[in-house]
Amino acid sequence: LYNALYGSDVISETDDASRGNKYNPERGKKVIEYARNFLDENIPLFKSSWKDISEVPKVYNGKLSLKLKDEKQFVGYSGTLNGLSSLLLKKNNLHIGIIFDPDNKLEVFNPEGNQDKAKVHDIILESAITAIIDHEDSVAAVDAEDKVLGYKNWLGLMKGNLQTEFEKGGKKIIRKLNPDRIYTKSEKKGEPNFNEIKFHGRALMLNRNVGHLMTNSSILLKDGSEIPEGILDAFITVTAAIHDFKSKGNSRTNSGYIVKPKMHGPDEAAFTDLIFEHVENESVR
């Protein structure tokens, strides 16, 4: 949340809070203030405010040292009891993670170090439950070269090793898939203490194939004509998804998830069913 707020127009650039080419502490203050207001609105404290917190909270006997207005919003934590590295909270069954950095070990863009008085490094929000990876023809994958790149990226997502590097502010940044997040459960009546819980660090990914009417020059048939692109998509994207079955990094049920657009009536829907029947039969061989 901190990085997203800092780099967007959600935070005004007035009052010396411009984004600029280097880290601006005044803008950083506005980011922290916005985040505290967000927590006060969604995870309110009992007769207090997140703005008043000046140290990393602790957990005693499975219970949080901070008194929440609704204690059921405390889900779990990671780190040691006296040195939390994160808190897991929830609102409307969507989770909010607060990451702490009491020893200033995590990298920040501020040359002076973490300016958050409670040593909050970041706030992580549970986002969309699903994400569509688009292989459709209109924009995402127009020609054969686009298609191959799209398949390569999808394979990397299914293997869990896709990453990219770029420069920001003179520093090399690596973006890669988030690992699963491990927490210790908060104490609740009827449950043993210190049960471990795991949350997927990534949204569930679905692949949007093309509709039936398109062809693609990435594979040519014996007569020189282009392959029906929807059939190609079905076999390649599902085959790549098999890599995920062992790790369960995406599917919890050893499944591949396909979005099939632009079906014009029952005949085309039946043809889709026939395609995926063949895909499943070939995949289990």
Positions of the model-derived regions?
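Catalytic alpha/beta active-site cores
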Residues: 1-271, 277-284
